[in-house]
Swiss-Prot record:
<dbReference type="InterPro" id="IPR051903">
    <property type="entry name" value="Zein-alpha"/>
</dbReference>
<comment type="function">
    <text>Zeins are major seed storage proteins.</text>
</comment>
<dbReference type="Pfam" id="PF01559">
    <property type="entry name" value="Zein"/>
</dbReference>
<protein>
    <recommendedName>
        <fullName>Zein-alpha A30</fullName>
    </recommendedName>
</protein>
<keyword id="KW-0677">Repeat</keyword>
<keyword id="KW-0708">Seed storage protein</keyword>
<keyword id="KW-0732">Signal</keyword>
<dbReference type="InterPro" id="IPR002530">
    <property type="entry name" value="Zein"/>
</dbReference>
<feature type="signal peptide">
    <location>
        <begin position="1"/>
        <end position="21"/>
    </location>
</feature>
<keyword id="KW-0758">Storage protein</keyword>
<dbReference type="GO" id="GO:0045735">
    <property type="term" value="F:nutrient reservoir activity"/>
</dbReference>
<comment type="similarity">
    <text>Belongs to the zein family.</text>
</comment>
Length: 234
């Protein structure tokens, strides 16, 4: 009887321990291997044997794959940095050679433009005409180049003497530019006596006698017949 009770207690204890026991499954290598990158070395797959060491081993494997490449990368970058000034210098030399070839190809035209263009645009177009213009006296310049030196009046380009006469008479009347003879007969220059234009001597006499007597303006003969008393005219 006692033996039966002891066996019953043993069975109850085993059942209780089986109910509270924890199952530890074996590590599966297939899912972990599928998560690893394909470019890692074959030694990385061996770290999956122990799940506790897996992150540490993976980190070591990645570092071992990158570190051998870093010196090569540093050497290439330093070489590129050293070559950049050489590239700039080469580009500057090529540009200078191109400019030199362009200047040598058009040396005559370049020298003419540099000498004459800042002073006159005519030198860039026709150097011979520019030299002739520089050698001409100042009095002959309007006749040789009327459009350049007399742009304010078109008459000077056609007839220089007529233009000079017009410039002398123009401040008094615009009619002088058309007909100088008609301009002299106008009352603008003879406001005191209308008939004095044909005779300048009579005009001067009238200008002298005008402040004393108005009779000289109408009848010169009657004015001379007037008696002179005390130096005054009546």
């Amino acid at each position: 009887m006692a033996a039966k009770i002891f066996c019953l207690l043993m069975l109850l204890g085993l059942s209780a321990s089986a109910a509270t026991a924890t199952i530890f499954p074996q590590c599966s290598q297939a899912p972990i291997a599928s998560l690893l990158p394909p470019y890692l070395s074959p030694a990385v797959s061996s770290v999956c044997e122990n799940p506790i060491l897996q992150p540490y081993r993976i980190q070591q494997a990645i570092a071992a794959g990158i570190l051998p490449l870093s010196p090569l990368f540093l050497q290439q970058s330093s070489a590129l940095l050293q070559q950049l000034p050489l590239v700039h210098l080469l580009a500057q030399n090529i540009r200078a050679q191109q400019l030199q070839q362009l200047v040598l190809a058009n040396l005559a035209a370049y020298s003419q433009q540099q000498q004459f263009l800042p002073f006159n645009q005519l030198a860039a177009l026709n150097s011979a005409s520019y030299l002739q213009q520089q050698q001409l006296p100042f009095s002959q310049l309007p006749a040789a180049y009327p459009q350049q030196f007399l742009p304010f009046n078109q008459l000077a380009a056609l007839n220089s003497p007529a233009y000079l006469q017009q410039q002398q008479l123009l401040p008094f009347s615009q009619l002088a530019g058309v007909s100088p003879a008609t301009f002299l007969t106008q009352p603008q220059l003879l406001p005191f006596y209308q008939h004095a234009a044909p005779n300048a001597g009579t005009l001067l006499q009238l200008q002298q006698l005008l402040p004393f007597n108005q009779l000289a303006l109408t009848n010169l003969a009657a004015f001379y017949q007037q008696p002179i008393i005390g130096g005054a005219l009546f």
